[in-house]
Regions:
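A short coil-to-beta-strand element that immediately follows conserved catalytic motifs
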Residues: 71-81
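Active-site-adjacent beta-strand/loop module that shapes the phosphate/pyrophosphate-binding cleft
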Residues: 82-103, 112-120, 134-140
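Conserved Nudix-box catalytic region and its N-terminal flanking loop in Nudix hydrolases
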Residues: 28-67
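Short, charged/polar surface micro-motifs in flexible loops or helix N-caps
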Residues: 24-29, 37, 52-53, 86, ...
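Conserved N-terminal beta-strand and adjoining loop/helix that marks the start
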Residues: 4-30, 50
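Structural detector for helix-capping/boundary residues
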Residues: 49, 63, 76, 116-119
Length: 145
């Protein structure tokens, strides 16, 4: 099965890589509401961000979780790759929060966070398109988390 997808037919060329963290507790996914000062303000999505020069995707995932949520995570498994309409190659990884870590969002990047079931996430009208595409790919059986 394919682990790659395009999120729009009218996409820009891929110019930058990004890491997306899929963090699950039971049947709930960790989702964030993006702050009003970042790209796609107020949108609901999984945490993540750009890969810096010299970083691997896994290193970027760890760094972004520390920056956005103040937590140490352990990348577990690459599950999917997609391309955003803004020209990002999105690398979707499952990850686990290290024991004893407490989520403390950086309000400059994250307005709030919430643990939600898949149906709660996909029914949110503010869901970022790339996250809707992620759940659609799961429902098509392209991969499992």
């Amino acid at each position: 099965m394919s682990q790659e997808s395009e999120t729009s037919a009218s996409m820009q060329p891929v110019t930058k890589r990004a890491a997306v963290a899929i963090i699950i507790d039971g049947d709930k996914f960790l989702s964030i509401k993006r702050s009003r000062t970042v790209r796609a303000p107020g949108k609901i999505c999984f945490p993540g961000g750009g890969v810096e020069p010299g970083e691997t995707v896994e290193q970027a995932l760890v760094r972004e979780m520390q920056e956005e949520l103040g937590i140490a995570v352990r990348p577990i498994r690459f599950v999917w790759r997609s391309n955003s309409v803004r020209g990002f190659e999105l690398n979707w990884w499952t990850a686990e929060i290290e024991d004893g870590e407490v989520i403390t969002p950086d309000n400059n990047e994250v307005e709030s966070f919430k643990w939600r079931t898949q149906s709660e996430v996909v029914s949110d009208p503010e869901l970022l398109d790339s996250n809707a595409d992620f759940f659609a790919a799961i429902n098509r059986g392209e991969f499992e988390v």
